[in-house]
């Protein structure tokens, strides 16, 4: 029964194939060959050729495992500068009037070709060539130089004013010295008093430093330590 069922299934498939693509009746002289050629020309055959790969790559996918593409952040475009674009356009209109000798040849990056640039070298630099040449010279003061006669007059006037101020200061010091002498003070006594004041200030600075360190160690303020040593806040 099983063989009979297989035979019926095979006959059914064969009849279906004949119905889809009927075969013309056989004729003498090999008349069926054109039909075979027509079928071969219509049908497309795909040949799959397997090339044995290395042993360590068998059973793996032929394409390498790549990481998934990360989503790209949208590019942030800066503010537009229409003023710069207009300036470049106006400069491009003026450039054709310039001579071709001023337009140098600039090498393109990553290539051995020399391409003639659209702008002169002065356009590439921030300062004009005239300014760079002037900078190479000696330093010039921004103040205008006075004339010879005017300079002599002003210098003499300024010298007279300085001399007058020094004389007034000397007279003032002489008056103070004469006043101290009249009160009974002497120059040696005044110098001794000044040296004692300097020594007092030095000792006071050292004492304040020691009081501050002691206050930090005890965790109190220096104001609380003054009565302990018999000192006043005015000292």
UniProtKB/Swiss-Prot annotation:
GO terms for cellular component: nucleus; Swi5-Sfr1 complex. Belongs to the SWI5/SAE3 family. Component of the SWI5-SFR1 complex. Interacts with RAD51. Signal peptide: none annotated. This is DNA repair protein SWI5 homolog. Component of the SWI5-SFR1 complex, a complex required for double-strand break repair via homologous recombination. Its main location: nucleus. Changing residue 173 to P: Does not affect interaction with SFR1/MEI5. Keywords: Coiled coil, DNA damage, DNA repair, Nucleus. The gene is SWI5. Residues 156-183 form a coiled coil.
């Amino acid at each position: 029964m099983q063989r009979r069922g297989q035979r019926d299934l095979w006959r059914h498939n064969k009849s279906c194939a004949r119905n889809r693509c009927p075969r013309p009746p056989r004729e003498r002289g090999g008349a069926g060959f054109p039909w075979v050629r027509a079928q071969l020309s219509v049908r497309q055959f795909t040949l799959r050729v397997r090339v044995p790969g290395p042993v360590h790559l068998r059973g793996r996918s032929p394409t390498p495992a790549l990481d998934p593409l990360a989503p790209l952040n949208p590019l942030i475009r800066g503010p537009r500068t229409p003023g710069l674009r207009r300036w470049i356009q106006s400069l491009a209109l003026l450039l054709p009037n310039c001579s071709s000798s001023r337009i140098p040849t600039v090498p393109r990056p990553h290539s051995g070709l020399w391409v003639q640039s659209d702008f002169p070298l002065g356009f590439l630099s921030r300062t004009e060539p005239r300014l760079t040449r002037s900078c190479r010279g000696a330093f010039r003061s921004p103040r205008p130089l006075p004339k010879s006669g005017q300079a002599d007059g002003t210098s003499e006037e300024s010298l007279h004013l300085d001399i007058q101020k020094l004389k007034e200061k000397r007279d003032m010091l002489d008056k103070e010295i004469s006043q101290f002498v009249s009160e009974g003070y002497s120059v040696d006594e005044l110098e001794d008093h000044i040296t004692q004041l300097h020594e007092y200030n030095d000792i006071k600075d050292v004492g304040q430093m020691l009081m501050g360190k002691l206050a930090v160690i005890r965790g109190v303020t220096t104001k609380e330590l003054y009565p302990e040593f018999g000192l006043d806040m005015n000292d």
